[in-house]
């Protein structure tokens, strides 16, 4: 990936890491079969630490304007990546004293608005568990 990747580059990188055997395990674990709670969810077969490594490498400079493309992905892990980028950015702002920092307040509000706009894309318990307490719980 480039130093400042686009959403498409992040998706392409994550797709290049696909693991078919792990994909099958995840699809069973997250109940993606007909009539199950995760019906239709698609997986690349990446483990959460792999996704967190991607987030760690891109989150600092990743533009919020690129996050919706990640959140709209058919891939579960790519949506998780988008959510964790929002969490990372939000947590960084949450550590600041916001009383007199209008820019930080606006940034935090922008992240919250974006999260709520795409909340339906957090469509499985793990996506909710890893993002809601960190953003909406503050």
State what each model feature region is.
Residues 1-138:
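Alpha-helical scaffold domains
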């Amino acid at each position: 990936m480039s130093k400042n990747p686009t959403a498409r580059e992040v998706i392409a990188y994550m797709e290049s890491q696909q693991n078919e055997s792990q994909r099958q395990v995840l699809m069973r674990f997250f109940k993606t079969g007909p009539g199950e709670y995760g019906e239709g969810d698609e997986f690349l077969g990446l483990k959460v630490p792999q996704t967190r490594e991607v987030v760690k490498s891109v989150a600092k400079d990743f533009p919020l304007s690129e996050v919706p493309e990640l959140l709209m992905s058919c891939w579960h892990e790519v949506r998780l990546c988008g959510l964790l980028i929002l969490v990372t950015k939000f947590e960084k702002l949450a550590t600041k004293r916001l009383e007199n920092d209008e820019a930080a307040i606006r940034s935090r509000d922008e992240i919250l608005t974006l999260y709520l706009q795409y909340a339906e894309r957090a469509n499985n318990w793990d996506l909710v568990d890893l993002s809601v307490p960190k953003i909406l719980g503050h």
